[in-house]
């Protein structure tokens, strides 16, 4: 900065007379220069312009020289200018001055004030560097990080270069000569004001225009100018969309409807499909339950297959509705994309926007036909398809299987042991025990081909019968006994007595006779489960009923004595 004085403080050297020179020299000797320090900005007067140099006197013994190139506007002799003192006395005895650094110091001071106040500064982006751009702040170079350029990525950075625009100073470090600025902060501040204004006006049902800002797996974020909204995948189209990128592109202009606005969180939910009429309102009439149709397979899922009903509308055939014979059949094994199939409409859910279909119900259920031809009790012969740890699978035709559980192989022997005697492919004779159409299950049995040998035992030793048994074996968990020297029975340890201290198998001996009550019969083995405890409790209750006294003066010992006397 230069200031032209109305009166020249020092006339041109050619006009200075000898007398004035002596007076001026004396005056300089008396001037106090202690306040002038290196690395500071002071005012000086231009005393001569010689060749490419501007000679400036700052009040020191020696004048300083500054290249003309450091001045934006060349001063005149006599002008007062601010200069930066590099060194008071250099190698050649001259004072080293700088006009550029003086201007920069002044600018730094102004920028520091603006930074502390949070004020914006004007600048121009003029270059690209690693990680960002360089900005000219009226002579001071600042760094603009790439992350601080805009609120969203800019495809063509040249569109914002060499244009004077406002910036916000983020940080200043004079020692490192480093200033970091932000263009994004300016945009966000103006955007924040516009955002508040827009949020105050936004309402559900409004139709707005926006730009696709970001695409994710679950939807797309739409820039509405000053605020973003979420367009969920399910609100893009009434038809099926697997990924938003199938119908949307980055920076694409779209028209959307505000379908939900949360005033607390300020979240905006958007929809495109809501701009059109809901096809589901008429779908129920168009596709009534029970209607048979044909359509193409469009997509597979772990739980079923999708079939096109018409353009933009699909229905789901659940895995359980593909075949009568395999409840959770993998659709990829029997169907292909684009394949034409026949199906029937099972349900139209207008709220969840789902159409449930069935392929198998267009065909006759082979299990129903099997049940008609082979009712329960029918004896059949069929080849063994597979043998597992728990039973035998038998081929019934039409890819149907029936199962013989290992417990239904023999009345007497363990089924798990007998499984080893069967081979895959062998023909086996069995009886139809049960048919469950809904669960698609046929239960078969081999042992049912012959009478139950334990049925006679079950008839003779009914539950509650009091019997006498002979102890054949004493075990830790109870007593093995024999009834009528032919039927096996067992008394559990806990059933030996109603007194806990008497529930000890070791108190009994082999060949000792014991009286007990029939509790249950294991039909598969014919073994009878007995209880001494239940027998004693029943006897006690009976005695109380028959011999008890209404005046409660008779004790339990008397009652039992009377009962025993009667038995004699």
Swiss-Prot record:
Tell me a Gene Ontology molecular-function term this record carries.
mRNA binding
- Sorted alphabetically, which Gene3D superfamilies does this protein's record hold? Nucleic acid-binding proteins
Under the heading CDD domains, the entry gives: S1_RPS1_repeat_ec1_hs1, S1_RPS1_repeat_ec2_hs2, S1_RPS1_repeat_ec3
Point out the coiled-coil segments of this chain: none
The record places domain S1 motif at 39-100, 118-184, 205-273, 290-360, 377-447, 464-533
Does the keyword field hold Amino-acid biosynthesis? Answer: no
Task: Provide GO CC annotations from the record.
Answer: cytosolic small ribosomal subunit
PANTHER family in the record, alphabetically? Answer: 30S RIBOSOMAL PROTEIN S1 (PTHR10724), SMALL RIBOSOMAL SUBUNIT PROTEIN BS1C (PTHR10724:SF7)
* Role summary: Binds mRNA; thus facilitating recognition of the initiation point. It is needed to translate mRNA with a short Shine-Dalgarno (SD) purine-rich sequence.
Q: What is this protein called?
A: Small ribosomal subunit protein bS1
Organism, per UniProt? Rickettsia felis (strain ATCC VR-1525 / URRWXCal2) (Rickettsia azadi)
């Amino acid at each position: 900065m230069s200031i032209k004085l109305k009166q020249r403080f020092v006339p041109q050297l050619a006009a200075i007379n000898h007398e004035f020179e002596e007076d001026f020299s004396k005056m300089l000797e008396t001037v106090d220069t202690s306040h002038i320090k290196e690395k500071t900005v002071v005012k000086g007067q231009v005393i001569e312009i010689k060749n490419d140099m501007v000679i400036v006197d700052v009040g020191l013994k020696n004048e300083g020289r500054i290249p003309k190139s450091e001045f934006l506007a060349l001063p005149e002799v006599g002008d007062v200018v601010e200069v930066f003192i590099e060194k008071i006395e250099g190698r050649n005895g001259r004072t080293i001055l700088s006009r550029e650094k003086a201007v920069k110091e002044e600018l730094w001071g102004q920028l520091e004030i603006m930074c502390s106040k949070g004020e914006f500064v004007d600048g121009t982006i003029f270059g690209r560097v690693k990680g960002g751009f360089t900005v000219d702040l009226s002579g001071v170079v600042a760094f603009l990080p790439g992350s601080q350029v805009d609120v969203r990525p800019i495809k063509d950075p040249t569109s914002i270069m060499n244009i004077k625009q406002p910036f916000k100073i983020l940080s200043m470090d004079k020692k490192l000569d480093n200033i970091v600025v932000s263009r994004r902060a300016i945009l966000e501040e103006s955007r924040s004001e516009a955002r508040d204004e827009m949020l105050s006006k936004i309402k559900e049902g409004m139709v707005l225009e926006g730009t696709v800002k970001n695409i994710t797996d679950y939807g797309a974020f739409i820039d509405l100018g000053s605020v973003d909204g979420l367009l969920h995948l399910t609100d893009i189209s009434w038809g099926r969309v697997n990924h938003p990128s199938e119908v949307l592109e980055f920076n694409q202009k779209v028209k959307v409807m505000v379908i939900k606005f949360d005033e607390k969180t300020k979240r905006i939910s958007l929809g495109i499909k809501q701009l059109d009429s809901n096809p589901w309102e008429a779908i129920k009439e168009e596709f009534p339950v029970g209607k048979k149709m044909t359509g193409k397979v469009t997509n597979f899922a772990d739980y079923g297959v999708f079939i096109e009903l018409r353009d933009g509308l699909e229905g789901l055939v659940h895995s359980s509705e593909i075949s009568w014979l395999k409840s959770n059949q993998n659709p990829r094994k029997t169907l292909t994309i684009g394949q034409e199939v026949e199906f029937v409409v099972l349900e139209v859910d207008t709220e969840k926007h789902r159409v449930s279909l069935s392929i198998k119900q267009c065909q006759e259920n082979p299990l129903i036909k099997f049940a008609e031809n082979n009712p329960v009790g029918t004896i059949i012969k069929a080849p063994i398809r597979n043998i597992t740890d728990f039973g035998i699978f038998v081929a019934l035709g039409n890819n149907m299987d029936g199962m013989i559980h290992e417990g239904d192989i023999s009345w007497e022997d363990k089924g798990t042991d007998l499984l080893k005697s069967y081979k895959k492919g062998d023909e086996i004779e069995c009886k139809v025990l049960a048919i469950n159409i809904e669960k698609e299950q046929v239960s078969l049995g081999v042992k049912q081909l012959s009478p139950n040998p334990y049925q006679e035992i079950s008839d003779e030793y009914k539950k509650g019968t009091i019997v006498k048994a002979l102890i054949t074996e004493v075990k830790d968990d109870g007593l093995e006994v024999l009834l009528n020297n032919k039927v096996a029975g067992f008394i559990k340890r806990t059933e030996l007595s109603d007194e806990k201290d008497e529930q000890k198998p070791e108190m009994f001996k082999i060949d000792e006779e014991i009286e007990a009550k029939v509790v249950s019969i294991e039909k598969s083995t014919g073994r009878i489960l007995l209880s001494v405890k239940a027998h004693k409790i029943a006897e006690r209750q009976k005695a109380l009923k028959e011999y008890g006294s209404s005046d409660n003066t008779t004790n339990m010992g008397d009652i039992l004595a009377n009962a025993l006397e009667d038995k004699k």
